Amino acid sequence: MSFFSHHPSRSPRIWTDILLRWQGSVIPAIASRVLVCMAFSLGVTLVDGWGYKFSIPIQESIVPSIVLGLLLVFRTNTAYERFWEGRKAWGTMVNTIRNLSRIIWVSVAEPSPQAHQDKIKILHLLVAFAVATKLHLRSQPLNEEIWALLPESGYRKLEDLNNPPLEIAFWISNYLQREYDQNNINAYQLTAMLRLVDTMVDVLGSCERILKTPIPLAYAIHLRQLIFLYCFITPFQIVNTLHWATAFVVGIIAFTVFGIEEIGVEIENPFGHDANDLPLDQICQTMQANLEDLIQLPPWHQISHGD
């Protein structure tokens, strides 16, 4: 399945499958909090049943409810903006690597068989840049995915670096400059290709900015404190009316507000392994498949109007 085709369908069958889906749901993350609120509500109900009556007018919660709702909306929107910015950055990465690989394959002259092999190696380096960026964003060490794309000497050099994608970008730029010095590309082609390399590095920087600029801690703490206060005050407002149904209703309210807040937590860092993160593994695999297809095309001097 392509990474473009995993979106929910409008089919009733698919809708039901998503409704009942556990993987990717926030239920496991919020279940304990919801149960705590329900247990507290049950305690309030028991105390109320013993004759200790509570009376907090429900009208007094209207303003706090609106404020909490606005805070939750802001929290979720901010997290989704980070998620979407990460997706756009990786979309730019895909397009840039496709464009640069196409230009290199078609435009760089091949005066010798070794030059052809060098072009293949540089296309693999383009995919290696994407894979290294993925691993860098996940704080993972280099693995066999990178090993398959690089010569052993290159892999060993990257092992000792804090930012392998930057080193790979340097290698790509160095290759392009060398081809220009050998008159295999002209100045205009060199400039165009170096701009694409710059775009790849810009994407890396954008992703690092998303990763290293979390939601302010004070905001996250205050929002969670407000959510707990809201869920703990609600039983006192409804127990006289709902009695033993209080815990159930509070559970629904807690599930709603904690769930919305947890969605923001899930998607604010879109570069991990979770079901709600970007499918970076699939994106990298797609790029590699695209470049392997490109390598199967005839060399630049054999191409004639698509024949």
Curated annotation (Swiss-Prot):
Swiss-Prot/TrEMBL keywords: Cell membrane, Ion transport, Membrane, Transmembrane, Transmembrane helix, Transport
Topology of the protein relative to the lipid bilayer: Multi-pass membrane protein
Organism this protein belongs to: Synechocystis sp. (strain ATCC 27184 / PCC 6803 / Kazusa)
Source organism, top-level taxon: Bacteria
UniProt entry tagged with the keyword Signal: no
Alphabetical list of InterPro entries matching this protein: Bestrophin-like, YneE/VCCN1/2-like
Subcellular location, record wording: Cell membrane
Family in the record: Belongs to the anion channel-forming bestrophin (TC 1.A.46) family.
Signal peptide per UniProt: none
GO molecular function, one term: chloride channel activity
Pfam families from the UniProt entry: Bestrophin
Protein known as: Voltage-dependent anion channel-forming protein sll1024
Bilayer-spanning residue ranges: 26-46, 54-74, 226-246, 247-267
Tagged with keyword Cell cycle: no
GO cellular component: plasma membrane
